[in-house]
């Protein structure tokens, strides 16, 4: 669950919008080279799944969060009715029987 304010912070789709002129995410000038090995040409190390990549732990259950910039996991955010990114109350769960199965 994410509030309206935090929806703007969510990531964008990686695919290029080639059908739109002046799209932000196109690689027309100096994009990725063809047949380029990114592991050899990149300046920093390759993908490190266990390294610090912006993912933190949930403030309630201490499990890993699967969305960068979030403070709560989706299960806890659903149970409490709060935004996963900022913790703002999104849903009144007073009369609900919330379960995360």
Curated annotation (Swiss-Prot):
Function: As a component of the minor spliceosome, involved in the splicing of U12-type introns in pre-mRNAs.
GO-annotated molecular function: microtubule binding; PDZ domain binding
Subunit text: Component of the minor spliceosome, which splices U12-type introns.
A Pfam entry, by short name: Cript
Alphabetic keyword roster: Cytoplasm, mRNA processing, mRNA splicing, Spliceosome
Organism domain of life: Eukaryota
GO cellular component, one term: dendrite
PANTHER family linked to this entry: CYSTEINE-RICH PDZ-BINDING PROTEIN
Keyword hit for Cytoplasm: yes
UniProt-annotated location(s): Cytoplasm
The family this protein is said to belong to: Belongs to the CRIPT family.
Phylogenetic placement of the source organism: Eukaryota, Metazoa, Chordata, Craniata, Vertebrata
Source species of the chain: Ictalurus punctatus (Channel catfish)
BP GO terms, sorted: cytoplasmic microtubule organization; mRNA processing; RNA splicing
Record bears the keyword Cytoplasm: yes
Transmembrane portions of the chain: none
InterPro entries: PDZ-binding_CRIPT
Name of the protein in its database record: Cysteine-rich PDZ-binding protein
